[in-house]
Amino acid sequence: MQDMRLQGLYGISESGWYKRPHEAIELLLEAIEGGMKIFQLREKEGSDEEILPLARALWNHCRQKGVLFILNDRLDLALSLGVDGVHLGIDDAEASRARILLPHGIIGISCYGDLDRAHKAKEEGASYVAFGSCFPSPTKPASSVIDLTLFKKAQEELAIPLCAIGGIEAQNVGELIHCDMIAVISSLWSGGVAQVRKNAKGLIQSWRENRERV
């Protein structure tokens, strides 16, 4: 059975938030007010000890607001905090190991443009899979851009929530009609605290309008 919470705007933090925790909390709260339903703390630098204070604070805010909180990669930290789940990439722990450690948690797996990897992830217990980069991405400029028809095929074959990621902005999000979540970084946080709520609402509105036409 699909987790019905896995839908909507999925915000992913920019790198280095743990170095500016007060701003990070403000950004998170503004995104939530704008309609963000899922948040992922993604910190590829810094130790678990350095990230722990911010992770705990953001998790508490998400819990109070009814927003899902996902940690990127850091499975041990996710277990110690008791957050909603983890997101794993190609170099992270396998979904099967994560499912053993998080029997009731959300496990997301990056599948890039690989449908076979998505099938394997589902078999190993993934809650959702992510495909991308959907468009050229300023966060990962070297990433290959996938064929968006992959989403329709995955929707037909997988029967688990699908997340689109990579280069998504208000001007192109309308092309993503066969996914459950849109994961964004740059287009959500650009402009800082004063702009985030507007960014979130704009992304959601553009996506919703185009999906309703289909």
Swiss-Prot record:
What reactions does this protein catalyze? 2-[(2R,5Z)-2-carboxy-4-methylthiazol-5(2H)-ylidene]ethyl phosphate + 4-amino-2-methyl-5-(diphosphooxymethyl)pyrimidine + 2 H(+) = thiamine phosphate + CO2 + diphosphate; 2-(2-carboxy-4-methylthiazol-5-yl)ethyl phosphate + 4-amino-2-methyl-5-(diphosphooxymethyl)pyrimidine + 2 H(+) = thiamine phosphate + CO2 + diphosphate; 4-methyl-5-(2-phosphooxyethyl)-thiazole + 4-amino-2-methyl-5-(diphosphooxymethyl)pyrimidine + H(+) = thiamine phosphate + diphosphate
Cofactor descriptive note:
Binds 1 Mg(2+) ion per subunit.
| GO CC, alphabetical | cytoplasm
Q: Which CDD domains match?
A: TMP_TenI
- The superkingdom of the source organism is Bacteria
Gene3D superfamilies (UniProt xref): Aldolase class I
Q: Kindly give the SUPFAM superfamilies that the UniProt entry links to this protein.
A: Thiamin phosphate synthase
A GO MF term: thiamine-phosphate diphosphorylase activity
Name the residues that bind 2-[(2R,5Z)-2-carboxy-4-methylthiazol-5(2H)-ylidene]ethyl phosphate: 137-139, 167, 185-186
Per UniProt, Mg(2+) binds at 73, 92
What does the record give as its pathway?
Cofactor biosynthesis; thiamine diphosphate biosynthesis; thiamine phosphate from 4-amino-2-methyl-5-diphosphomethylpyrimidine and 4-methyl-5-(2-phosphoethyl)-thiazole: step 1/1
The reply on keyword DNA-binding is no
Enzyme group, top EC level?
A: transferase
Record key words, sorted: Magnesium, Metal-binding, Thiamine biosynthesis, Transferase
**Residue positions binding 4-amino-2-methyl-5-(diphosphooxymethyl)pyrimidine:** 40-44, 72, 110, 140
Question: EC number(s) on record?
Answer: 2.5.1.3
- Cofactor needs: Mg(2+)
Instruction: Reply yes or no: does the keyword Metal-binding apply.
Output: yes
* Cited InterPro entries: Aldolase_TIM, ThiamineP_synth_sf, ThiamineP_synth_TenI, TMP_synthase
GO BP field: thiamine biosynthetic process; thiamine diphosphate biosynthetic process
Matching PANTHER family: THIAMINE-PHOSPHATE PYROPHOSPHORYLASE (PTHR20857), THIAMINE-PHOSPHATE SYNTHASE (PTHR20857:SF15)
Q: What does this protein's UniProt record list under function?
A: Condenses 4-methyl-5-(beta-hydroxyethyl)thiazole monophosphate (THZ-P) and 2-methyl-4-amino-5-hydroxymethyl pyrimidine pyrophosphate (HMP-PP) to form thiamine monophosphate (TMP).
Q: Which family does it belong to?
A: Belongs to the thiamine-phosphate synthase family.
**HAMAP family annotated for this entry?**
TMP_synthase
Q: What is this protein called?
A: Thiamine-phosphate synthase
Q: Which gene encodes it?
A: thiE
